[in-house]
């Protein structure tokens, strides 16, 4: 639920390495 400051419209979340995942075109961490 916390925004990771990254979008994932065209590319995946690079912040995935710190448990961030794509949701509604924005990367979130829980």
UniProtKB/Swiss-Prot annotation:
Superkingdom: Eukaryota
Gene Ontology biological-process entries: cytolysis in another organism; defense response
Here the cross-link named Cyclopeptide (Gly-Asn) sits at 1-30
Write down the SUPFAM superfamilies for this protein, in alphabetical order.
Cyclotides
UniProt keyword RNA-binding, yes or no? no
Q: List the disulfide bonds.
A: 4-20, 8-22, 13-27
Keywords of the record = Disulfide bond, Knottin, Plant defense
According to UniProt, the tissues expressing it are described as: Detected in stems (at protein level).
Post-translationally, this protein is described as follows, namely: This is a cyclic peptide.
Q: Which family does it belong to?
A: Belongs to the cyclotide family. Bracelet subfamily.
What job does the chain carry out?
Probably participates in a plant defense mechanism. Has cytotoxic activity against HUVEC cells (LC(50)= 2.17 uM) and various cancer cells including HeLa (LC(50)= 3.05 uM), MCF-7 and K562. Displays very weak hemolytic activity. Binds to and induces leakage in phospholipd membranes, particularly ones containing 1-palmitoyl-2-oleophosphatidylethanolamine (POPE).
Notes concerning its domains: The presence of a 'disulfide through disulfide knot' structurally defines this protein as a knottin.
In its UniProt entry, what is this protein called? Cyclotide hyen-E
Traced from the root, the source organism's taxonomic lineage reads: Eukaryota, Viridiplantae, Streptophyta, Embryophyta, Tracheophyta
